[in-house]
Amino acid sequence: MDTAIDFIYLSEPDMIAAGVTDMAACVDTMQDMFKLLYAGDYRMAGPNSDSHGAMITFPDPPPFPTMPRNTPDRRLMAMPAYLGGSFGTFGVKWYGSNVENREKGLPRSILMFMLSDVDTGAPLALMSANLLSAYRTGAVPGVGARLLARPDARTVGVAGPGVMARTRRARCGDEVNDGPFQEGRRAGPHDS
């Protein structure tokens, strides 16, 4: 019996080549996902199957010399989910975040995504997920703009500008009247 498990690794350039930055497709996918959530054809972590994941935290001060310090924005999270419908997939987003990463020339958050076979649990792909998460985040309000914006809407507002706000603003603008918005407004402590 062959017990080898093959899976692919998709780096950030591989993810771009696979279409992760196709925002229109991201919005379509998120709209399909919301329909499945509404129907209940999904599962997440937690006792009610709707938890946003499991996060590791650290005591302050750390009781052991090798234990990470409890610092602002230090997060280590596993975010598992099953999505049914035509997706029929199981995956886990690994979220590692530390504001001190910037001092090392790294992004604040470093994300990976493991896609697994629903029946066997075997890994299918391990993916760089910073762009995946950013474009998914931007696509969600794009769905809202698509479905809820008035036909004459020309202004989009973004609360909490930052890295994620760039994709939110870009997508909402494309969804309003099938074209770029004429005015953008932001509210938050950081420039986007």
Cite the ranges covered by each PLM segment:
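N-terminal ligand-binding/catalytic initiation module
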Residues: 1-133
